[in-house]
Design a protein with these regions (language model features):
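Acidic interaction surfaces
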Residues: 1-107
Length: 107
C-alpha cells in the first residue's frame, strides 16, 4: 500500500466513525444533541485536519488498529491546555475596544 493509500484509508475509517457518531446523535432528542454540539464540532475539525495531513506509514498503521481513532484523538485533544477561554476573552475585549475607538476619537 502506498503512503497516499494509507492516508486515504485512515481518512475513510475516521469518516465512517464520524458518520456513525452523527447517526447516533440524530437519534437523540434535540436538547441532548445540543449537549454534544461541542464534541461534534471538534470531531469534525479532527476529520478536516486528517484530510490535509500526510501521516507517516507507521502513524497510519497504528491509527488503523484503533476501533475509534476519532474518539482517541478527541480524548487526547481534551487533555491539552489550549487557553481556549482565554482566547475567547481576548476576542471579547478586542471587539469592545474596537467599538470604543470612535467614541475615543470624538473626545
Amino acid at each position: 500500500m502506498t503512503p497516499e493509500e494509507r492516508n486515504t484509508a485512515i481518512y475513510h475509517k475516521m469518516e465512517a466513525e464520524q458518520d456513525s457518531y452523527r447517526d447516533w446523535l440524530l437519534t437523540l432528542p434535540p436538547d441532548e444533541i445540543l449537549q454534544h454540539a461541542y464534541e461534534y464540532a471538534v470531531r469534525q475539525d479532527i476529520l478536516f485536519a486528517i484530510e490535509d495531513l500526510e501521516l507517516q506509514p507507521e502513524q497510519c498503521r497504528v491509527l488503523m488498529k484503533s476501533p475509534c481513532p476519532v474518539a482517541d484523538v478527541l480524548r487526547n485533544f481534551e487533555k491539552l491546555e489550549l487557553g481556549y477561554m482565554e482566547t475567547i476573552r481576548d476576542c471579547i475585549e478586542g471587539r469592545a475596544d474596537k467599538l470604543l475607538q470612535p467614541e475615543k476619537e470624538v473626545r
